[in-house]
Amino acid sequence: VRIGRDVIEVSTYRGSDTGHQEPRRGRAKKKILPNNVFGRREEDVLRRDFTINALYYDPVKEVVTDYVDGLGHIQERRLETIGDPRERFSEDPVRMLRAVRFKAKLNLRLDAKMEKLLPRMAGTLTTVSPPRLFEEIIKVLHNGHGAVGFQALDRYGLLQFLFPSATRHFGEQDLNKTNGLIPCALRNTDQRVADRKPVISPFLFSVLLWRQVQQASRMKSGGNRSIFENLHSSADGVLQELHPTVRIPRRISAVMIEIWELQIRLEQRRPRTIKRLLSHRRFRAAYDFLLLRAGAGEVSDSLADWWTEIQEMPPTDVQRMIQGLEQSKPQRKKSTRRKRKHT
């Protein structure tokens, strides 16, 4: 329900579904939750996940009904499940991601039993459908507190089950809290959310999978294929490997590949392509990515500074900078071989 610029989410009361107590399994043995069964408010409260998420507001009487001490837990800044957390997480493992999201966004303290259970039950995330996990990851990383949320995913052992291959490729350049690629990208995204600026999910996912794609591409180098062919082949392989866990929609992955490809072109700085790159629809995202890589020590600061400077220049100075590149490029030697005469 929209009220001015605010959005209030409304849900129906759900009752107990005696005919479908357990989630059914899809073809890939992933959990498919049963359809909603309408019920009374007293039934609905027992189906909620956390106490702070089980408050009922009457907009006419302006009264909040609290059956499970949710208001008290909010005041104590404590997150508790309704009932046994093991049972709640078994019913729907996505609740573990929701716990991390609430903790990060609202600065809550997790119940001690819940904290112990998260690492033990993290593996049950593999039973959740890949498209649903993609949506839940977006909610954790795009709510304005993604940096803290990512740390919590890592701390509780959830991250390795969301990105099993990518996490094995993470190194100091990726995870360093001061200038690592991922923490800096998440802090920048958090700031954009705070400033009410748009954020795009392809950017963060391109950062998260970059190291794996980069290393896979390097392993393919040296053959007959171009650097761009190797990149596309590696990107396809990485995304395909991730599919059973987290399924990134094609509309997202296509943008990710564009951002990765532009990293190569920005590093090459070929004079004939500079103006075309500056007008590329993904240039800004690729440029921001390049700045993060420079901060992490992956590319030189001078390269990042050059691309920063050329964007601020008038057209005549842009041409001068491009000419400077042409003059600095080593000239190819003309072939001295004589052309063969055909008889």
List the predicted regions and their residue ranges.
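Catalytic cores of the polymerase beta-like nucleotidyltransferase superfamily
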Residues: 1-343
